[in-house]
């Protein structure tokens, strides 16, 4: 069964959850498909979500570390985008920082519906310890990863591609492979490529088979009338 491209402009806010336990209460971890966005508090996560959905769906703040909740946005009845709390901001109290990191790890390891993870990093300061931890958690769980090098407009094209190649080389040891792409919310750099990757993650084989079966059943019911 073929399906047209997912329209990310249809994303709408669904719920916020303070932690993985509450998220599992609201949305069981084995229902539908989720794509998670994770990154340091100043990586431009909210701006990226706003560009990709072409709306101000995620709240941006001049104060890094302000997003403390897991925010879920619905694309359709089967698919969701998840904005995870930013990590690594120095001014956040240590206890809260550790709670966030524990929650992020638990989310990546225990959400069976997770179809892919976008790890956003400032292209000028990529692959910090927590970035690597997020990537390793996802790879260990056999979840596809896109390392998105944000604020790519801050570098010239030559320096930009040099950094992209360096990051690809540093991540090449992961057997399942980690995609690496430059991105700029300001200039729209990489938007098309990212949407293509997200679109493919939204269409796992099991879901496409389910949708095909549902369509056949619906047609059979219609034919009875």
Swiss-Prot record:
GO molecular function terms noted in the UniProt entry: GTP binding; metal ion binding
Binding-site residues for GTP, renumbered to this chain: 39-46, 65-69, 83-86, 150-153, 183-185
Annotated binding of Mg(2+), by residue: 46, 67
Cofactor annotation: Mg(2+)
UniProt xrefs under Pfam families: MMR_HSR1
Entry GO terms, CC: cytosol
Keyword vocabulary terms for this entry: Cell cycle, Cell division, GTP-binding, Magnesium, Metal-binding, Nucleotide-binding, Septation
CDD domains in alphabetical order: YihA_EngB
Stretches that traverse the bilayer: none
Residue ranges of domain EngB-type G in the record: 31-204
GO process terms (BP): division septum assembly
InterPro entries listed in its UniProt record: G_ENGB_dom, GTP-bd, GTP-bd_ribosome_bio_YsxC, P-loop_NTPase
Signal peptide: none
Highest taxon listed in the record's lineage: Bacteria
Protein role: Necessary for normal cell division and for the maintenance of normal septation.
Similarity-based family: Belongs to the TRAFAC class TrmE-Era-EngA-EngB-Septin-like GTPase superfamily. EngB GTPase family.
Classification via PANTHER family: ENGB-TYPE G DOMAIN-CONTAINING PROTEIN, MSS1/TRME-RELATED GTP-BINDING PROTEIN
Name assigned to this protein: Probable GTP-binding protein EngB
Originating organism: Shewanella pealeana (strain ATCC 700345 / ANG-SQ1)
